[in-house]
Every structure is written in C-alpha cells, then in structure tokens.
C-alpha cells in the first residue's frame, strides 16, 4: 500500500471535541485515546492480541478510520457503558405493564450511552377503550411525551444528549397527531420523528384513493391518501419533521429478511434494526487517501481504501464481543446477526481535493468506485472472518444469497459466501458522523456536501449554554495552507446544490450499502412547497430507503451558520 499523505494539523475544534467527548481520565493527548481503544478492541482476538492492538492503533492514529463515538468514549475505560451508538428497543406491548417495562428498558439503555429507536405503532389510538379497564386510551403521542421527559432527565448533565427516533405506521389512526407532534417549538425535543410509509400508501396517492386508518385489524376511519401524504410533507416543510422511511423497501432489501421483519431504525436513520438490534459504526475518512491534492496529479489510493475496509470490518466485529450491552436481549440480538456498519466520511472534501464537483457525473462515479471497493473488501473480510471465527448464527446460505442486495454482489463473492459462510449479516452503513468528522479536522460529514467554507457552529456545554465556534472546512483550510486563494476548484456548498443533486448522490451510494444512509437534503427557506414535495416523491422513485429534507430556518435557529464571503477565517484562534 502506498504511504498516505501527511495529515494537516488538527483544526481547533478537533481538540475541543476530543476533550469534551472522548478523552478519558489523565490521557495527555489523542494518541493515548487511540491506544486505549485499540487495546480494548483487540481483546476480542483469541490470540496475538498485542499484534492486533498495534494494527488497530495504526488504523486509528492517522485518522484513516474513525470509530463511532461510543467506541472512542468508552472502550477500555471499565465504565458500565456501551460501545454501540444506538439501539432499537423491543416491540412495545399495548398494556400499562408492557409500556412501563419498555420505558424502564429505554432508560437503562440511555443511561449506558446508547441512543434508541422505538416504533409506537402497537399503542392503541387516542379515544379507544382499554380492554381490561374500559378507560379511554390517550394514544401513542401522549406516551412519547413520557419517553421525552425520561430522556431529558436521564441525560441532562451530559455533553452528549440522549437521542431517540420515534416512528409510526402511515395507517395508524393517530398518524395525524404524530405528524403534528413537533409543531409547537420545543415539543418532543429529544425525538427525531419518521413516518413508516408503505408501498400501498404511495400507490393510493397515485390513484387518489381512499386510505383506511387501521388498528388491530379494524378500520377506525378513512381519509384520502393524497391528503395524508400532503399533510406529512406540509409538516416537514414547516418544521423539518417528520422524515420518511420507505419501510416496505427496507424490508425487501434486508439481508436477513428471511429471519426478521424491521419496524424501526436508529435515531439518525442509517441502520434499520429488529427489536433489540444495535448499531456498530465506524467510518473511513476519504480525505486520507488523496495524494497531491489540488493538482492535476491528484489521485485516490483505492487499494489502501480496500485494506482499511478489511481491517475496519475486523475492528467492528470485535466491538460486538467486547462491548457492554445494557440489556441481555440486546447482546443476544447483536450476536445473532452480527450487524456492523462500515461507512465513509469526508466524501465532499475528497472530491474537492481532486477538483471534482459534488453534482458532477465524475463526482458520482468517484463515490460509486469508492463504495464498490469498500463493499467488495468488506464482504471479503467478513468471509475470511467466518473461516476463522464462524458465520453469524442466523446464516443460511441459500436464504442469504437469495436476498436482493446479495444478488447484486459480484459472482466471486457469492461463491465465497456459499462455500465459506460470512461473519456479518450486514456490513455497510453511512452515518452522519457529526462529532467524529469534527475530531478528524472538520472533514465534510458522511456523504454530505460541504455546508460552507467557514461556519459558525453552536456547541452545547454541560451547563446547557451554547458557545459559538468558527470553523473552516478541511479541504478549504488545506487549500489555503498550500497557498491557494479564494475557493478551490470543484468547491460547491450544500445550499448551492439542487435537491436533485443531493438525491442523485444518495441514490448512487445506496446501491452499494446494505443498511441505509443518513442524509439531509438542504433546501432554501423560500423553496415552494410543491418543489419540496417533489423531492420526496423523487426519493421514492430512485429507490431510497428514507428521505429527510431540511428547509433552512424551519427549526428556528440553525446549528450551523455560514460565514459570508470576505469573512473567511483560517486562523487557529477562530
């Protein structure tokens, strides 16, 4: 493998993130953190643990691979905290005992550091009679407020606030109350909301058909599908939520569709999970693989990406074995399927470093080549791990290879899986990578475009107050450190891109990802509602698993604010 280019010195925000989120005890510098994490994860190896610790340290120390935040914060600390970023909780039981048992399990999981996802569809609608008591039910949204208050209480004193995803089926009788649940500012502040949209709803919208709202097999009332669809999109337009999950497509594309049905996902949407499923995440930092940036000779080392992907899969597989699990059911579920989510970050910056525009055919071709390389390397590594350590317990070769995603794998990989098995049911997911991208020098997050050359970022302190920190984008800073002026060739920001350009990149990436993708499509504040609504329909037509569109200013004060041209800042004091 070719030597990697030297890393530019970390941005000021990087040290701030390390101190607030990932530093443990008396660690003097980030290399102490890397060594702690590498040693802890290598402990899963049956032999040669010191050797694997060194290999994992090399993976981390030059920022090639950035593990999920819970891994960085908790591995090797002896804290009773999980290394897994998020979980989907068990299926809710529509009884007072069942709901408060689920609330308790959610509290235990949040206390251990995990975000959670919940499907509230099993809860009877408001106004229905309870079976045993005859009391009138208050509906799922009322119970969501209970979860929200619990989450606020459990995580109020932490730099990392509790995160929850709440979902509801599009045919639940309380779907309209769910859609409007965050219209009031500050309501359900700990939740992201998404509607589980079925193929039947899309067909009914197309046919301008009636849409029955159903609970326990009984139709409660009927409305026009088109009116419901527009109400979902109008709420998203006005408030930024709910997002949409195309749940039938998620289940069709699930590698374990022969053994489970998915109803929910993690809070950021990149990993649909079964009840008690867990997110085990890490991202390859693409900026570390671009040599001679901003020159005609700029190139990407795809062989090094493949090698990093192979080692990253082993790292994440080990995490499943060394992690603490808040609940035994979570440990059981994680080890049945051994899902991991290897992703990327820094895509937009890697494009800029090569002079490629995010919205160009060449930019999408680069993303496809990167993710195709990663997919093949990750599946190869998982087959090799199966030879060493065994396949995941739910593996059935015929059923696994009959799934849509595995059908699209190269034939040599399908043959290898049939002959040798595979260690992990899922291998790829693209997370938002907010904090770890800041740790890596403020590289562009996940597959998102660069938000702006320089931004002012609101950062929450433990006190609950917010500071404002100025930050340069990684590629922009690298360009200026090399003597460049203005903006580098190929530099384009999220706000300058059309929604179609965002969607095209997400669709390109989704074809290579067996889990899902966390992606926000940015829209101008003055975008007409009709154009906004078309984005969601295009997302459906392109085969995406989910869609979130954020219209600037629709959630009040934005976390990121661009600094206008002429006020760029490249100093370390900004």
Regions found by a protein language model. Give the residues of each.
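A structural-propensity feature for long, helix-poor, extended segments
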Residues: 125-164, 291-324, 379-380, 388, ...
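Active-site cavity-forming subdomains of large catalytic enzyme subunits
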Residues: 2-9, 84-302, 325-329, 378, ...
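Acidic/polar, glycine-rich intrinsically disordered N-terminal extensions of enzymes
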Residues: 1-83, 90, 207, 229-233, ...
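Terminal amphipathic helices with adjacent charged low-complexity linkers/tails
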Residues: 10, 14, 180, 196-197, ...
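Internal maturation/activation junctions in enzymes
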Residues: 216-218, 308-331, 335, 339, ...
